[in-house]
């Protein structure tokens, strides 16, 4: 009798002991991680084992663990050992593991006729769309692929031999991540008809936009790009054989690529052998950070072309433009560059074989910046006026630009950098945009990450795994991330890229020891406005210390670039609404005491004055970035 009672009791006690040894935990916000066989359950146990203090767990880090359930985790961990088998399950894996992967669009020979209106539509292949439609008509695409990761859209042989009008509004993933949009043989041989792209790919992260054989051999059609690619980050636009052999087909680019970060545009065989075409670029590349544009064989052999660039790359930071074989062998025609290339920091402009062989072309440059190279151009018909021969220090000074008025350049926006003396209770100061612009992703489980290649020497394997075609944006994203991760560290820097949370813990503890705390700014409240500093606390007593900072890098899975940062002071501060004095955020700021190794053109010195090693520089930790320090 007693044996029958004691045996179940012993089993129950053994079960409870086993479960307790597995550190079964329930996360806050109702996020259960009780199953010890999930990636998150494993991560929590790993934290408990490798961090020596009992301070509250950093759920902002632990919640970035892979969302795979136990069954999915076991399945994909087994599959990844066979990369050929794994790549066939890529789409389901990316969806389950919260990764950013491109969709696979299959070719389509379906024909589309009639007037069509597409609203809130995405990830489609339009082939032979609107081909040889007779009579006037109208096709409209509105709110197409909004706020998506890797939206892929292909328009091939679109509107060929058709006089229809086409309008794309809010097209190209406004606010999306890595959109891939291609227009091939668009409006070729069209008699009339117009195309309008309004608010195209605004605010996109790493857009990849291609127009090939666009409006070739067209007659009298007009193509209008308004607010094209604005506020984007690190993207690439290409126009090949655009308006070639056209007759009176005009193109307008208005507010093209404005406020972009490291944007690239290529125009090849643009307006070649065209008759009487007008091309206007207004407010092109305005207020950008290092925009690069290339015009090759632009307007070559045209008859009476008119090219106008107004406020081109104005008020940008650095930037490069190349015009090769521009308006060569043209008959008559006019090209005007007004308010051209007046960047804050000196950029580079190269004009090669410009207007050569033409019949009386008129080329005018008015109010253009420094560091321009003109090779092999028609000297008799080119005029240059109001050349700004300033030093880079002059141009970098905000008070010297635009008639002595201070210009708000978004790349050195107010509050992005500040002095340590600002971190006092009661100080009112601007806060920059600290919102995380990266796509939402999760870490790979370490067991899976360890089995995937991660080096530039194996990039072909990675491209195969992630279905990344050569020269695709996915391939470029992977290559850029790997190159940055393999870059040699700066003097005194220790660095590592981590694609699992366990790797981040290992790196931080290897630099700082096991008694560590990781911090981030609590939310984005106060961003892009004025804030008041409330109570403030110096980490490690406010003494100069060492920290580890981790910043996101664009990659299919969540990837962080972590590096040791010597000689810093770290602060936590309550952030208040300056009017109501209510607490709206809890921020983390880091002050770099030693800036002697920073470049003289670093944005901090443009914003604050002075130079390397002369001042300390502070900044906030942005949303989803992190800083590690030893625990107090």
Curated annotation (Swiss-Prot):
Major location (coarse): secreted
Q: InterPro entries, from UniProt? A: BURP_dom, PG-associated_BURP
Q: Name one GO cellular component term.
A: apoplast
Positions of the BURP domain: 417-631
Segment forming the signal sequence: 1-27
What keywords is this UniProt entry annotated with?
A: Apoplast, Cell wall, Cell wall biogenesis/degradation, Glycoprotein, Secreted, Signal
**A family per Pfam:** BURP
Which terms under GO biological process does the entry name? Answer: cell wall organization
Q: Which PANTHER family match?
A: POLYGALACTURONASE 1 BETA-LIKE PROTEIN 2 (PTHR31458), POLYGALACTURONASE NON-CATALYTIC SUBUNIT AROGP3 (PTHR31458:SF14)
Q: How does it assemble?
A: Interacts with polygalacturonase to form heterodimers.
Q: What is this protein called?
A: Polygalacturonase non-catalytic subunit AroGP3
Species source reads: Solanum lycopersicum (Tomato)
């Amino acid at each position: 009798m007693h044996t029958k009672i004691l045996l179940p009791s012993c089993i129950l006690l053994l079960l409870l002991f086993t479960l307790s040894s597995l550190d079964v935990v329930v996360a806050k916000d109702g996020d259960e991680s009780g199953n010890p066989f999930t990636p998150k359950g494993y991560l929590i146990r790993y934290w408990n084992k490798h961090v020596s203090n009992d301070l509250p767990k950093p759920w902002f880090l632990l919640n970035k663990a892979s969302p795979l359930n136990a069954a999915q985790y076991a399945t994909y961990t087994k599959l990844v050992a066979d990369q050929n088998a794994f790549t066939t399950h890529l789409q389901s894996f990316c969806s389950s593991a919260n990764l950013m992967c491109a969709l696979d669009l299959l070719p389509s020979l379906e024909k589309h006729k009639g007037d069509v209106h597409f609203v809130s539509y995405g990830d489609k292949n339009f082939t032979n769309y609107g081909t040889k439609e007779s009579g006037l008509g109208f096709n409209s695409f509105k709110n197409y692929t909004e706020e998506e990761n890797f939206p892929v859209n292909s328009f091939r042989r679109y509107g060929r031999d058709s006089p229809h009008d086409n309008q794309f509004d809010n097209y190209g993933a406004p606010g999306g991540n890595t959109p891939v949009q291609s227009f091939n043989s668009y409006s070729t041989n069209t008699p009339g008809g117009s195309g309008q792209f309004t608010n195209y790919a605004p605010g996109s992260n790493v857009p990849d936009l291609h127009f090939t054989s666009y409006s070739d051999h067209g007659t009298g059609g007009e193509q209008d790009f308004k607010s094209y690619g604005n506020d984007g980050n690190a993207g690439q636009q290409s126009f090949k054989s655009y308006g070639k052999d056209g007759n009176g087909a005009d193109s307008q680019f208005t507010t093209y690529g404005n406020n972009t970060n490291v944007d690239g545009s290529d125009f090849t065989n643009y307006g070649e052998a065209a008759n009487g075409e007008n091309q206007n670029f207004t407010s092109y590349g305005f207020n950008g950070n290092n925009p690069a544009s290339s015009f090759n064989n632009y307007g070559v052999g045209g008859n009476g072309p008119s090219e106008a660039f107004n406020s081109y790359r104005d008020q940008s930071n650095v930037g490069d433009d190349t015009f090769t074989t521009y308006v060569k062998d043209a008959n008559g025609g006019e090209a005007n560059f007004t308010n051209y290339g007046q960047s804050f920091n000196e950029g580079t402009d190269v004009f090669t074989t410009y207007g050569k062989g033409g019949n009386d072309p008129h080329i005018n440059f008015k109010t253009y910046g420094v560091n321009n190279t003109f090779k092999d151009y028609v000297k008799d018909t080119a005029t240059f006026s109001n050349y700004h021969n300033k030093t880079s220090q002059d141009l970098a000074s905000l008070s010297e630009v635009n008639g002595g008025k201070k210009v708000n350049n978004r790349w050195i926006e107010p509050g992005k950098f500040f002095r340590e003396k600002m971190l006092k209770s009661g100080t009112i100061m601007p806060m920059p945009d600290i919102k995380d612009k990266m796509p939402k992703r999760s870490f790979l489980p370490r067991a899976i990450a360890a089995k995937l290649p991660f080096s530039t020497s194996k990039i072909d394997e990675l491209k195969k795994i992630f279905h990344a075609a050569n020269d695709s944006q996915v391939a470029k994203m992977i290559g850029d991330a790997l190159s940055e991760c393999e870059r040699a560290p700066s003097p005194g820097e220790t660095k590592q890229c981590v694609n699992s949370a366990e790797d981040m813990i290992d790196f931080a503890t290897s630099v700082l020891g096991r008694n560590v705390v990781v911090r981030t700014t609590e939310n984005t409240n106060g961003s892009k406005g004025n804030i008041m500093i409330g109570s403030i606390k110096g980490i490690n007593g406010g003494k100069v210390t060492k920290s580890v900072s981790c910043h996101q890098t664009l990659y299919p899975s969540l990837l962080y670039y972590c590096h040791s940062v010597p000689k810093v002071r770290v602060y936590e501060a309550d952030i208040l609404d300056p009017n109501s004095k209510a607490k709206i955020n809890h921020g983390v700021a880091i002050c770099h005491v030693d800036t002697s190794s920073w470049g003289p053109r670093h944005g901090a010195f443009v914003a604050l004055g002075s130079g390397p090693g002369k001042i300390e520089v502070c900044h906030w930790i942005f949303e989803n970035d992190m800083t590690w320090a030893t625990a107090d």
